[in-house]
């Protein structure tokens, strides 16, 4: 995963046409990140496995404390446990959980139709989504974090406390912290930002949202096949083959029937 391609979607990526959403993308950690639309990034990375990162504006990061017995039914109970934190109907959301620490499970929640649209767009471009995580989750170990890359301005105070904001809003929040501002991890250019995200992905930080029905195996199994363009031709060839086979079988049956009749007639003549 350390050398996988990266696509980092800007805040508000799902508000308009998804293919036109602004992204930072990187073919590998050794390459310089580029800015463009999601459609352009997927076109450039066609045939590749890609790590996808969304901002905290698109994913709710939280956690729940459960006993082992309760944890057996984690996926069933999450919508009820998080009901007060949800701004959308549970059936419109996808819930993903990570490994528990001292009985507390980290949870990531994302809009399900948005997730499905993102995966479908990847498949259209023959790109295999390998991972989907939130930036605040990946950078949680470095908090507080200040991202000042144009279009990605974000304040991450803790894993579950992040604010996507413009420069004026960020300055207002920073003013409340006074001298604490000096302790912020500052990510001020695309190269540094992508490098930190790639390092966190390589270290397997954060909750993986592509699990269950959206797992990597499912994405790979249902992804585009190189034989897809040939399927109509293969189907026609198969139909022609079976028609020809049926014709040969019918012809053999007629020959066999004629041979049997000839043999029967010969036997009658011989007996007479």
Tell where the protein language model's regions lie, with residue ranges.
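Hydrophobic/aromatic-enriched cytosolic interaction surfaces used to assemble or bind macromolecules
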Residues: 1-272
